[in-house]
């Protein structure tokens, strides 16, 4: 379901410009080519404050192009077409424009000059391919096709973004209709080069946009949302509600559009009151700009949630990692990373402190102790996380003692090893403090366990509060990960529907922290 709650009767004329997009091409209608141009244009026009009222797709028929363009041109301020501009027989946009405006076609010498600049390169390319016969005729036909445009056309020369020079090829405009190429690369480039000419900064309508995410289904609050929209009926506010079925962090996205900062703030407050306790500060790239996001997260937990004890744990763990990063060079620090939830917390903390001191481009050193019959999903997550977080992960056979020996042999300079061990872990219970040297009969490393005193709930609160990506097995009912031979979905998360079908709740829904590892047979 998709819902839009319009808190506006009709925009007063002359305030916000309107536009229609006409996509032209049989290949779009046949499904042989995917249209990405309308999506690109909608995003760009929307950011410019233009109200997109319509998207139409028509085939390569002159009458269809003419009819759609004529209708849109009289109804909206701007019409942007894409496709049907080129040298072949089925490129009929210019013919359709001439028909729509009862105009004649003529040959443009200005376009011919632009075409002539490309011809030597084209001819040389064909000759290098051994094609010489008939090339002059091809050039003649191509030139005639590209240069034949409606007589009333205006040629728009854009500004190249790289060097500020005039664009190399013009775009045809007839009345309020702008004809862009259909090839996405050229369509996007042409729009970029013409944006400020078509939509001067001083003429743009100021618009304010915001997005709020919630872990509620939209059915849970749709009636109350309609009431909020009604309260702002006279303030030109538009609230959109969009369900998301596959996102692990939120279920519904709300968008707000308005013309004033005052009404935006009022709507934002109203929606946050409506969704209190269920707002998600969604972040699709949690591994970027980590320092600022970390500060904002702690502030929310302290000010909004009054979660003093949790913030204290965050800061204690942060301080431990910070001390290690300050004390040791990065080539002496390694992170034990097996794709589990605890070491994922550590990965984010280490990335945060490395970003703070060295910058995001600095790589992190890590290693993975392999387990027998490892879940392929865990392996894939390690690969993905390594790419996101810029961590170089070595693999060593297990168990841990043998793996550490392999690490020290390959990287003898390693001293501190960050681990996601907690006091409730089978091995974590032997640690008295978060930072300890290994026993004398082990490879000598400094074991650093910043979240030693965290609970299962603490781990999930941080991961989900910052939208840190984690292994998808945790959303399938697994609460602790080992190998496939000794790990099952947690029985406490099993749900049986009325039709007898079963499914499992995600791991963060487990209420009893003490049962975290009861889905593992070897612990």
From Swiss-Prot:
Q: Name one GO biological process term.
A: FAD biosynthetic process
Q: Where is this region: FAD synthase?
A: 332-489
Reply yes or no: does the keyword Flavoprotein apply.
Answer: yes
Q: Which Gene3D superfamilies match?
A: HUPs (3.40.50.620), MoaB/Mog-like domain (3.40.980.10)
Q: Where does this protein act, in terms of pathway?
A: Cofactor biosynthesis; FAD biosynthesis; FAD from FMN: step 1/1
EC number(s) reported in the record: 2.7.7.2
Q: What Gene Ontology molecular function terms does this protein carry? A: ATP binding; FMN adenylyltransferase activity
- Do the record's keywords include Calcium? no
- Region of interest: Molybdenum cofactor biosynthesis protein-like: 20-111
Co-factor(s) = Mg(2+)
Alphabetized, the UniProt keywords read: ATP-binding, FAD, Flavoprotein, FMN, Nucleotide-binding, Nucleotidyltransferase, Transferase
* Catalyses which reaction(s): FMN + ATP + H(+) = FAD + diphosphate
| UniProt xrefs under Pfam families | FLAD1_M (PF24102), MoCF_biosynth (PF00994), PAPS_reduct (PF01507)
For this chain, the family text in UniProt reads: In the N-terminal section; belongs to the MoaB/Mog family.
Q: What is known of its domains?
A: The molybdenum cofactor biosynthesis protein-like region may not be functional.
- Briefly, what is this protein's role? Catalyzes the adenylation of flavin mononucleotide (FMN) to form flavin adenine dinucleotide (FAD) coenzyme.
Can you name this protein? Probable FAD synthase
- Which lineage do the record's taxonomy fields give for this organism? Eukaryota, Metazoa, Ecdysozoa, Nematoda, Chromadorea
């Amino acid at each position: 379901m998709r819902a839009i709650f319009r808190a506006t009767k009709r925009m007063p004329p002359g305030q916000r410009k309107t536009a229609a997009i006409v996509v032209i091409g049989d290949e779009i209608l046949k499904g042989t080519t995917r249209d990405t141009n309308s999506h690109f244009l909608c995003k760009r026009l929307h950011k410019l404050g233009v109200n997109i009222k319509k998207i139409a797709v028509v085939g390569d028929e002159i009458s269809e192009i003419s009819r759609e363009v004529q209708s849109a041109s009289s109804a909206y301020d701007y019409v942007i077409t894409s496709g049907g501009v080129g040298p072949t027989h089925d490129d009929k946009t210019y013919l359709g424009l001439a028909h729509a405006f009862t105009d004649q076609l003529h040959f443009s010498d200005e376009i011919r000059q632009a075409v002539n600049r490309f011809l030597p390169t084209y001819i040389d390319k064909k000759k290098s391919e051994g094609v010489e016969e008939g090339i002059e005729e091809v050039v003649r036909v191509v030139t005639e096709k590209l240069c034949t445009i409606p007589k009333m056309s205006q040629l728009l020369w854009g500004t190249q973004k790289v060097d500020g020079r005039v664009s190399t090829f013009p775009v045809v405009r007839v009345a309020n209709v702008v004809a862009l190429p259909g090839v996405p690369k050229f369509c996007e480039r042409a729009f970029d080069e013409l944006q400020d000419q078509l939509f001067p900064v001083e003429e743009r309508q100021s618009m304010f946009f915001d997005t709020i995410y919630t872990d509620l289904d939209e059915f849970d609050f749709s009636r109350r949302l309609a009431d909020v929209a009604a309260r702002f009926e006279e303030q030109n506010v538009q609230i959109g509600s969009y369900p998301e079925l596959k996102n692990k962090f939120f279920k519904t996205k709300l968008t707000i559009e308005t013309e004033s900062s005052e009404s935006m703030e009022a709507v934002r407050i109203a929606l946050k009151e409506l969704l209190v306790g269920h707002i998600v500060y969604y972040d699709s790239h949690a591994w970027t700009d980590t320092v600022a996001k970390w500060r904002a997260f702690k502030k929310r937990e302290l000010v909004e949630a009054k979660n003093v004890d949790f913030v204290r744990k965050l800061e204690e763990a942060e301080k431990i990692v910070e001390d290690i990063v300050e004390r040791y060079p990065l080539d002496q620090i390694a992170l034990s990373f097996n794709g589990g939830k605890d070491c994922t917390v550590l990965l984010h903390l280490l990335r945060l402190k490395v970003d703070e001191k060295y910058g995001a481009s600095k790589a992190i050193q890590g290693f993975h102790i392999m387990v027998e019959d490892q879940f392929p999903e865990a392996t894939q997550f390690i690969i993905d996380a390594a790419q996101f977080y810029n961590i170089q992960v070595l693999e060593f056979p297990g168990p841990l003692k043998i793996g550490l020996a392999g690490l020290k042999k390959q990287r003898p300079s390693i001293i501190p090893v960050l681990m996601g061990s907690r006091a409730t872990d089978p091995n974590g219970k032997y640690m008295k403090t978060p930072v300890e040297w290994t026993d004398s009969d082990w490879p000598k490393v400094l074991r650093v366990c910043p979240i030693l005193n965290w609970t299962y709930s603490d781990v999930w609160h941080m991961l989900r509060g910052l939208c840190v990506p984690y292994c998808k097995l945790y959303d399938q009912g697994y609460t602790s990960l080992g190998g496939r031979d000794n790990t099952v979905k947690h029985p406490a998360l099993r749900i049986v529907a009325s039709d007898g079908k079963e499914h499992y709740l995600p791991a963060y829904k487990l209420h009893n922290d003490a049962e975290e590892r009861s889905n593992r047979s070897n612990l």
